[in-house]
Amino acid sequence: MTDVVIIGAKGRMGDTLVRCVQQSDDLKLAAVMERSGCEEGLDSLGCVCGTDAQEVLTKVPGAVVVDFTSPAATLKLLEIASVTGNPVVIGTTGMTNEELAQVEEFAKKVPVFLAPNMSVGVNVLLKVLPELVRMLGDAYDMEMTEIHHNKKVDSPSGTALKLAQCMAEARGLVYDEVKKHSRDGIIGARTKDELGVMAVRGGDVVGDHTAYFLGPGERIEVTHRAHSRETFAQGALRAARWLSEQKPGKLYDMADVLDV
């Protein structure tokens, strides 16, 4: 039995995670956390609940923390978890390179897993897309689009950035040098190596990502569509089960969990 702590338990993702843990045969809801002023009703879950991470984590030693919040909140949580020893599964997106470097430092002290998207399908794409890049060669232009609900605060999505990065690297390019997150006005023709990553926001779309390979006389589109947040929740809980048996030393990702 793996004990789990859900951060942001009353949010869209947190609520889904709580429900999935409650329905699981091998997971136990050890604790839940929310921001001050948002904790009303949490005590009905029958576990440790609170707004102070230090206080909550001290009461549930060894429990795996699952966090889908914000970069600042995640880093604060990691600082506390590195003292209490709780492993942490991170689904937070929108981190800067500097923030990611801090996460890697914390991973030396406590088991940490980080993935912008925890669905099995997206992580299969991370393996498939580089193969397509290599087979098609540089005669095909590469682009990426993503669609998310109108409440998403970061753009482009962490998943789109990760997919585009793996495509760029497969062609021997440095992503930060070729990325194009917007096009506006008379900007001239598309350069040979640039890789556009464009975002659409609206409605209640859980998450669509499409990679484009546009060549002479044809194009290939590879799309992943998430129909439910439960896809991400189950992936995060799969990671939590796995992380509970790991040691600190490296920043783990979904490739480690899936052994691919």
From Swiss-Prot:
The residues the record assigns to binding NAD(+) are 8-13, 34, 91-93, 115-118
List GO BP terms, alphabetically: diaminopimelate biosynthetic process; lysine biosynthetic process via diaminopimelate
Pathway where this protein functions? Amino-acid biosynthesis; L-lysine biosynthesis via DAP pathway; (S)-tetrahydrodipicolinate from L-aspartate: step 4/4
Pfam families xrefs: DapB_C, DapB_N
Q: Provide the top EC class.
A: oxidoreductase
User: Which catalytic residues are annotated?
Assistant: 148, 152
Which positions in this protein are listed as binding (S)-2,3,4,5-tetrahydrodipicolinate? 149, 158-159
Q: EC?
A: 1.17.1.8
Query: What reaction does this catalyse?
Result: (S)-2,3,4,5-tetrahydrodipicolinate + NAD(+) + H2O = (2S,4S)-4-hydroxy-2,3,4,5-tetrahydrodipicolinate + NADH + H(+); (S)-2,3,4,5-tetrahydrodipicolinate + NADP(+) + H2O = (2S,4S)-4-hydroxy-2,3,4,5-tetrahydrodipicolinate + NADPH + H(+)
List locations, semicolon-separated.
Cytoplasm
* Single GO cellular component term: cytoplasm
Q: Provide the function of this protein.
A: Catalyzes the conversion of 4-hydroxy-tetrahydrodipicolinate (HTPA) to tetrahydrodipicolinate.
| NCBIfam families (alphabetical) | dapB (TIGR00036)
- This protein is called 4-hydroxy-tetrahydrodipicolinate reductase
Provide the species name: Maridesulfovibrio salexigens (strain ATCC 14822 / DSM 2638 / NCIMB 8403 / VKM B-1763)
Instruction: Report the gene name.
Output: dapB
